[in-house]
Amino acid sequence: MYKAVFIDVDDTLLDFNACAAQAMQRGFAMRGEAYRQEMFPVFRRINLGFWQKIETGEITRAQLEADRWNTVFAALGLPHLDGPAFEVDFKRFLTESAVPIPHALETLQILAARCPLYAATNGPQIQQETRLAKAGMLPYITRVFTSETIGAEKPSPAFFAACFAQLPQLTPADILFVGDSLTADMAGGIDSGMATCWYNPQTLPCPAEITPTYIITDLRQLPQLL
């Protein structure tokens, strides 16, 4: 039915929250700062807000990297910490963290035997390839498309157009795009002419304005769509 699969990385193949919590904790430890679990939801909320602004084109990735941790530290009452310096360490620690989503590896193994798999992510190229390799997933992925290399972020049509330009043997209709984000993945995939599969493990409601082709709650449901 489909000749290829595009698949998101963070929160589709790798558990971003678990990886980010590990990286945040390591960053605090190297500074001799006490880390408490209730700090992570503050980061998660602020980080999500920054990424939503990136997806809508309101800010650049450079602005996120410059401002993200200063905003987090201000909210946590830790203004003495250097946000840009913490950003450098956080990204390094995140690159070393690869907590898989349940059943992600076995699903990739099944899918890769049927058609080419392409990762499509807004994460940095080396970071995402390193994390996928550490999780044992990279051998099953034909190519990793990242916004860093392409120069455009999902859900921008420019991101997907650049991917398609490197795959002349495929049309958008040949591709199933799998991801957890309704905006970056589903809306972006729909607007680019691909069939879409929303990975929705929390069974969240789907807004009327976005209509994925499929909705799954467990990655083990994915092979039956091919």
Where are these regions (language model features)?
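Residue-level marker of alpha-helix boundaries and capping positions
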Residues: 60, 98, 119, 176-177
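Glycine-centered loop/turn motif at secondary-structure junctions
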Residues: 32, 77, 114-115, 136, ...
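N-terminal start-of-chain detector that recognizes signal peptides
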Residues: 68, 73, 89-92, 116-119, ...
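N-terminal helical cap/lid subdomain that shapes the substrate entry/recognition surface
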Residues: 2-102
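A short, Lys/Arg-enriched amphipathic alpha-helix followed by its capping loop at the start of a domain
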Residues: 26-31, 107-115
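Residue-level detector of secondary-structure transition/capping positions
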Residues: 28, 47, 112, 167-168
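Asp-based, Mg2+/Mn2+-dependent phosphohydrolase catalytic module
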Residues: 1-5, 18, 105, 109, ...
